[in-house]
């Protein structure tokens, strides 16, 4: 049996049984071709350096010819040398280049913006109100380091990241990152040393190997050290991506304050790069700043960051940084797939998962994030309280209908019914999409469980929450049975915590039969959190808080003794400050009706808070 899928199955993106011929080729009456495995083939350092030098020579010569007068081109061609010691740096501006610049005095950018060129792959953006001048300047910056220590299982950690956590980190384009990773140079745009270590820190948390899981903090430190060495003052897209990954890591480990700061730094650095504006409108000397392919990649990165910003703000109950009204970037389009990265992709189970593209998934999450952002502004923002509870209840009903409309308008291959929901739990991507939808419904309706009013089709906040919790359980069960909880994505941790918080609120006013069902829900989510507590410290710390809360309701919440151990995790060596524990207490303590504004920001924490 072959180790690789045949070319026909790769192009069709279908599972290959790896026989010769495979079943798919036999049925289609096609020749079953197995391409050679060149992934481990590496050229010598001398050979690579020679090619890089020759490429730099060609680029330098072409740059001179492009701006030179016609009469000077023959002399430039005569002076071409094919030696391998030429510098890769571009020539300084000559007199004829300066004359061409003066001739083109009118910028093609409509608004009075400034672009500061910081090397070949970085352009810093200044808006119309900036105090900086509009001249295009060039400032040197150190190249991103491409050296990676071989003492860590880098490849395996990256595989874990892209297989299990990728759905929540779509601000990274997998194909471009891996292409540059396997073709390393000092001039990468989408791969850097600090970003590699940041992805490894998250990826190894999805490992079944406890030794590899324990290396996550070491990867985090290596990522931060490499980022500091490169320089936070040197804005780069991989640095922004690295900061955002490290922010997610800190939040998942229970350090919400540190994670929030890192995420904010990432978004600010992205705005410094102008990633919220369409680069197709940018020209320097009548030459586009970026190519169409680069513009498409920047679109993927921006909208991935937008989704991450809304998601982090939503789970922490805080204001967003990126606004849809501030961007001119078009929605993400499908980008070409690369062959040879099958080891970094999970074979999608079910008919629904096999028919979705990453761009399609991202655009659906973006539209869902737009609703989420509106909920934060019009339901949970402090200024909305002055309009009274009646208007807020109207907004709750409005956004419940918006969520229903989003669900009804899903494409046929992604629209789910309750009987089909288990199929969506077989794919990390679709599981994220569904859980995010139910997470929003829970957080929107949970504070209003005790309020009564006129609702369409009996869509009371209580009924919506009970229904959503059941759907969350179906998805998690399907994920556990098909993929296992040791590869749990972060969204499942958040879904369990929010579901438990909602269940505790549902105890008030519940009938005896409902109380029994709610007790079983607590047991289920405790069981899941216990299983994944060795991978994510946020789950580990939440268990004790849930148990303490459950005793207040006399639920006697326990999981099966043979499967779950609710004792403190002795292997957990992470040190958390008291302020971080207080953040977690907010997840479940609805007695804190007067939340700490210094800790929670302008919005109340949607993980836990007062009932209205």
UniProtKB/Swiss-Prot annotation:
Subcellular location: Cytoplasm; Nucleus
GO biological process, one term: DNA-templated transcription
UniProt keyword annotations, A-Z: Cytoplasm, DNA-binding, Metal-binding, Nucleus, Transcription, Transcription regulation, Zinc
GO cellular component: cytosol; nucleus
GO molecular function: DNA-binding transcription factor activity, RNA polymerase II-specific; RNA polymerase II cis-regulatory region sequence-specific DNA binding; zinc ion binding
DNA-binding region: 6-32
Any Pfam family the entry gives: Zn_clus
Principal location class: cytoplasm
Name by which UniProt lists this protein: Uncharacterized transcriptional regulatory protein C777.02
């Amino acid at each position: 049996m072959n180790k690789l899928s045949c070319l026909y199955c790769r192009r069709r993106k279908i599972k290959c049984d790896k026989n010769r011929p495979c079943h798919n080729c036999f049925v289609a009456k096609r020749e079953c071709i197995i391409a050679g495995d060149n992934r481990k083939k590496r050229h010598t350092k001398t050979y690579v350096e020679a090619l890089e030098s020759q490429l730099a020579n060609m680029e330098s010569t072409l740059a001179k010819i492009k701006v030179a007068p016609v009469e000077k081109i023959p002399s430039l061609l005569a002076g071409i040398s094919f030696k391998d010691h030429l510098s890769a740096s571009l020539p300084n501006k000559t007199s004829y280049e300066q004359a061409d610049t003066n001739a083109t005095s009118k910028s093609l950018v409509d608004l009075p913006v400034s672009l500061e060129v910081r090397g070949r792959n970085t352009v810093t953006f200044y808006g119309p109100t900036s105090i900086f001048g509009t001249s295009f300047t060039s400032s040197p910056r150190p190249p991103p380091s491409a050296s990676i220590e071989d003492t860590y299982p880098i490849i395996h950690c990256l595989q874990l990241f892209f297989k299990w956590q990728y759905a929540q980190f779509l601000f990274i384009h997998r194909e471009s990152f891996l292409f540059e990773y396997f073709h390393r140079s000092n001039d990468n745009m989408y791969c850097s040393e600090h970003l590699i270590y940041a992805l490894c820190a998250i990826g190894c948390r999805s490992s079944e190997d406890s030794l590899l899981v324990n290396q996550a903090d070491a990867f985090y430190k290596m990522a931060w050290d490499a980022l500091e060495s490169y320089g936070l003052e040197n804005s780069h897209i991989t640095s922004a991506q690295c900061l955002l990954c490290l922010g997610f890591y800190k939040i998942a480990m229970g350090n919400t304050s540190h994670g929030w700061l890192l995420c904010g730094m990432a978004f600010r650095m992205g705005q410094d790069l102008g990633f919220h504006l369409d680069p197709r409108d940018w020209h320097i000397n009548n030459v586009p700043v970026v190519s169409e392919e680069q513009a498409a990649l920047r679109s993927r990165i921006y909208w991935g960051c937008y989704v991450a910003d809304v998601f982090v703000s939503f789970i922490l109950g805080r204001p967003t940084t990126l606004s849809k009204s501030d961007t001119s970037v078009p929605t993400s389009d499908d980008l070409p797939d690369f062959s040879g990265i099958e080891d970094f992709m999970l074979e999608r189970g079910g008919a629904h998962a096999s028919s979705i593209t990453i761009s399609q998934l991202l655009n659906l999450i973006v539209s869902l994030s737009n609703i989420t952002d509106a909920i934060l502004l019009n339901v949970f923002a402090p200024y909305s309280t002055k309009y009274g509870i009646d208007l807020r209840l109207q907004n709750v009903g409005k956004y419940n209908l918006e969520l229903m409309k989003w669900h009804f308008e899903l494409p046929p291959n992604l629209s789910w019914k309750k009987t089909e929901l288990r199929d969506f739990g077989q794919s990390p991507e679709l599981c994220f999409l569904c859980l995010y939808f139910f997470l929003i419904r829970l957080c929107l309706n949970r504070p209003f469980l005790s309020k009564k009013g006129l609702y369409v089709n009996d869509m009371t906040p209580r009924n919506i929450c009970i229904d959503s919790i059941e759907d969350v359980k179906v998805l998690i069960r399907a994920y556990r049975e098909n993929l296992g909880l040791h590869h749990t994505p972060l969204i499942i941790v958040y879904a369990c915590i929010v579901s438990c918080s909602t269940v505790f609120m549902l105890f008030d006013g519940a009938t005896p039969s409902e109380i029994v069902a709610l007790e079983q829900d607590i047991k289920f989510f405790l069981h899941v959190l216990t299983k994944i507590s060795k991978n994510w410290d946020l789950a580990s710390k939440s268990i004790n808080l849930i148990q303490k809360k459950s005793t207040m309701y006399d639920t006697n919440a326990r999981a099966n003794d043979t499967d779950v151990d609710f004792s403190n995790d002795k292997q957990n060596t992470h040190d958390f400050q008291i302020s971080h524990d207080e953040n977690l207490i907010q997840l479940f303590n609805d007695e804190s009706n007067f939340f700490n504004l210094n800790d929670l920001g302008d919005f109340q924490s949607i993980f836990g808070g007062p009932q209205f």
